[in-house]
Amino acid sequence: MAVLALVDGRRGLLAAAQMALTGLTALLLYRLLKRWTRRPRPFRACPGVIAHVPPLDEFSFPSGHTLQAVSFTVVALAWYPLLAPLLLTFTALVGASRVILGLHYPSDVIAATVIGSALGALSLWLLPLHVLVA
């Protein structure tokens, strides 16, 4: 995100600031939801499911990686729509990887996608581009 200010000047700085603020909000929301739901991870609850990498925390719901990737992508695409092929592919791979690695249930990833989309949309509604750039 820091590169945006160098590449796109003031506009890039504003985009990076909005992405950072949205990301921080996503992190806080993710932590609250994890503590509230306390859903065990698939590799702990389902025999035969193997965690291929160690988890960053104890609980499964929602997928923090997916929530961050989706909220970032929603905001980034509003600023830089030409990056859609790259960002949408990246975000889809993040979501799929969480299930493939045995760290999340598909519902964790789906819920994180919905929450991240809503959070990104809320960020764009509260801080619309035409107001920020004007």
Specify the residue positions occupied by each region the protein language model found.
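Membrane-helix interface/capping segments
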Residues: 35-47
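Membrane-embedded catalytic cores of phosphoryl/pyrophosphoryl-handling enzymes
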Residues: 47-134
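Terminal transmembrane helix and immediately flanking juxtamembrane interfaces
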Residues: 1-36, 50, 105-134
